[in-house]
């Protein structure tokens, strides 16, 4: 029974990721015929999958059936406790304190992550367990929290990971605010840089690491642009630094003056060149040329 529910949940998650809900109604009908239990709800996180599908779908029949299922499962969550075992009774108060079916499903899946044996070492299904961010009535801070949550939703990774992107966005904003202590330009620039890096299509690993909890909200709030950069950009910066050091060393050691090269900028032939072995020994040396007239630099192999 659990395997069947997990299979359906995975299919729904893929539909949400691809934004293609074809066949969703059939899956919901399958779920309707499965006798659901509180244990199944908590171990499979099917509630989150159905709720994500409901939010994205524009098909009235799909949204209606999804709401109906969530409503029926809600009865399992806050139903009578006479038949529940002690473990389920412990879970009940935390679950039933939520205000909506969606929140109950998210809370149920979040609290259950630490107890699931098969998720002990699975980072891709990690749900952050940091203290909830304090609420705020500041309109600027609320807007920043919304924008951070939206950035975390880029690519729909949060669905597969099972993260609460809204709470995570609030935690990041709270950490930024606690450090800066106001909502001035420094605060706004800090938030803006987090959003830009989270939405960077060339740096999806940063977003995934934040969603998985590998990068905690308070650490992410303090990271520099260099620390948030993609591996590709870090490598590029490393190479540029090496190049700058090499050129600086060349300038100090000098070179050989020649009129064999024509400057592409000023067309003069008053140049100085230096040859350096920048690659393996069996490769041609790299020639660095500096125009003594205008300072233009170029290189060739």
UniProtKB/Swiss-Prot annotation:
Alphabetized UniProt keyword annotations: Acetylation, DNA-binding, Isopeptide bond, Metal-binding, Nucleus, Phosphoprotein, Transcription, Transcription regulation, Ubl conjugation, Zinc, Zinc-finger
InterPro entries given in the database record: TF_IIS-typ, TFIIS/CRSP70_N_sub, TFIIS/LEDGF_dom_sf, TFIIS_cen_dom, TFIIS_cen_dom_sf, TFIIS_N, TFSII, Znf_TFIIS
CDD domains linked: TFIIS_I, Zn-ribbon_TFIIS
Keyword Lipid metabolism among record annotations: no
Additional record remark: S-II binds to RNA-polymerase II in the absence of transcription.
Family: Belongs to the TFS-II family.
Protein name: Transcription elongation factor A protein 1
Record gene name: Tcea1
């Amino acid at each position: 029974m659990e395997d069947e529910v997990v299979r359906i949940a995975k299919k729904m998650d893929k539909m949400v990721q691809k934004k293609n809900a074809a066949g969703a109604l059939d899956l919901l009908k399958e779920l309707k015929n499965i006798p659901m239990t509180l244990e199944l709800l908590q171990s499979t996180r099917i509630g989150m999958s159905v709720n994500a599908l409901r939010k994205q779908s524009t098909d009235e029949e799909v949204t209606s059936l999804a709401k109906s299922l969530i409503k029926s499962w809600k009865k399992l969550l806050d139903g009578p406790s006479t038949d529940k075992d002690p473990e389920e009774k412990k879970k009940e108060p935390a679950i039933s304190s939520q205000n909506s079916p969606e929140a109950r499903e998210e809370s149920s899946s979040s609290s259950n992550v630490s107890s699931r044996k098969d998720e002990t070492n699975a980072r891709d299904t990690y749900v952050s367990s940091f203290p909830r961010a304090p609420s705020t009535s500041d309109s600027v801070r609320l807007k920043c929290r919304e924008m951070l949550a939206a950035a975390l939703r880029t690519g729909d990774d949060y669905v597969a990971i099972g993260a609460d992107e809204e709470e995570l966005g609030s935690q990041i904003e709270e950490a930024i605010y606690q450090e800066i202590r106001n909502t001035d330009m420094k605060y706004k620039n800090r938030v803006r840089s987090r959003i830009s890096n989270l939405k960077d299509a060339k740096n999806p690993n940063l977003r995934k690491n934040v969603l998985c909890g590998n990068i905690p909200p308070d650490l992410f709030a303090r990271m520099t642009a260099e620390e948030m950069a993609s591996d590709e950009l870090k490598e590029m910066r490393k190479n540029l630094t090496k190049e700058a050091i090499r050129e600086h060393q060349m300038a100090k050691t000098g070179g050989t003056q020649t009129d064999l090269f024509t400057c592409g900028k000023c067309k003069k032939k008053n140049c100085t060149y230096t040859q350096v072995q920048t690659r393996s020994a069996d490769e041609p040396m790299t020639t660095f040329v500096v125009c003594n007239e205008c300072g233009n630099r170029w290189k060739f192999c």
